[in-house]
Amino acid sequence: MIQPQTYLNVADNSGARKLMCIRVLGAGNSRYGFIGDKIIAVVKDATPNMAVKKSDVVEAVIVRTRHHIRRDSGMTIRFDDNAAVIINKDGNPRGTRVFGPVARELRDKNFTKIVSLAPEVL
């Protein structure tokens, strides 16, 4: 459950390390974002000399949440951290690598490029 003011780790090599959510997109009028939802975020911590700088406003997709996900099979899954991948306007990731596992629900929401870059899909 990601809401405005939530801090997230960045799961790619775009140059940002920490994001703060400022708006949840694509969730209707809901206050919370879940895996596969797009968010507008501000970069709070970044690696020097990279494409993404501190205080940049970026669009990202949530790939991991500490809040559990219930699947149709009855299984629940949760991750150790809240994480997002920075994307461009076309929905493609700005980085060239994705770190850590991502949820299978991203494939259903047409983020296949992120799923293909991830080392593990749960």
From Swiss-Prot:
Transmembrane segments: none annotated. GO terms for cellular component: cytosolic large ribosomal subunit. SUPFAM superfamilies: Ribosomal protein L14 (SSF50193). Signal peptide: none annotated. Keywords: Ribonucleoprotein, Ribosomal protein, RNA-binding, rRNA-binding. One of its GO terms (biological process) is translation. GO terms for molecular function: large ribosomal subunit rRNA binding; structural constituent of ribosome. It comes from the Bacteria. Pfam families: Ribosomal_L14. PROSITE patterns: RIBOSOMAL_L14. The keyword rRNA-binding applies. SMART domains: Ribosomal_L14 (SM01374). Part of the 50S ribosomal subunit. Forms a cluster with proteins L3 and L19. In the 70S ribosome, L14 and L19 interact and together make contacts with the 16S rRNA in bridges B5 and B8. PANTHER family: 50S/60S RIBOSOMAL PROTEIN L14/L23, LARGE RIBOSOMAL SUBUNIT PROTEIN UL14M. Belongs to the universal ribosomal protein uL14 family. Binds to 23S rRNA. Forms part of two intersubunit bridges in the 70S ribosome. This is Large ribosomal subunit protein uL14. It comes from Nostoc sp. (strain PCC 7120 / SAG 25.82 / UTEX 2576).
